[in-house]
Design a protein with these regions (language model features):
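Hydrophobic transmembrane alpha-helices and their immediate loop junctions
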Residues: 1-156
């Protein structure tokens, strides 16, 4: 099921009104390539897609994982990052490189709902309970975001 959130419609309106159609089209293409990486592994491992949501913050594929295989889960959650990395290696455009590099960096941050959180969660679930993992990742994610904010203010 495809869901289009109101925030996505609002985002499209801003894109059309702002005059940044080219830049935001590149961003949207980067997001599509990222999600295609997830989709590739979801279909490869025959997992069930519950929905695809278009929001003002991106696209989210909600999948019902029926596998306990850690490698398969890591490939599904890391598939977006892999597709961005492959795209960087194939396409040598500086603009494209920057968008994909940022997408990779942001998705490696271990905060919900990003890929970094999902991958670390899969790895830690082999050793710890979900509640402990969520608590640890909450504090780690908060620390990382705080450091990013501080660095962005210091090194403008």
């Amino acid at each position: 099921m495809i869901k289009i959130k109101m925030s996505f419609v609002f985002f499209l309106g801003i894109v059309l009104y702002s005059g940044l159609l080219n830049e935001l089209s590149n961003l949207f293409l980067t997001i599509l390539i990222h999600e295609a990486g997830h989709l590739f592994f979801i279909l490869l491992f025959k997992q069930k897609i519950k929905s695809v949501e278009f929001t003002g913050f991106g696209i989210f594929i909600n999948v019902s994982l029926s596998t306990n295989n850690i490698l398969k889960k890591l490939l599904i959650f890391g598939g977006g990052i892999l597709s961005n990395l492959i795209f960087i290696l194939i396409i040598k455009s500086r603009i494209t490189y920057d968008y994909h590099k940022i997408m990779i960096f942001l998705n490696l941050i271990p905060i919900i709902p990003l890929d970094g959180f999902q991958m670390v969660n899969v790895l830690l679930s082999c050793f710890y309970e979900d509640e402990f993992i969520n608590d640890v990742l909450f504090y780690v994610g908060t620390l990382i975001l705080s450091l990013l904010l501080i660095f962005s203010l210091i090194f403008k």
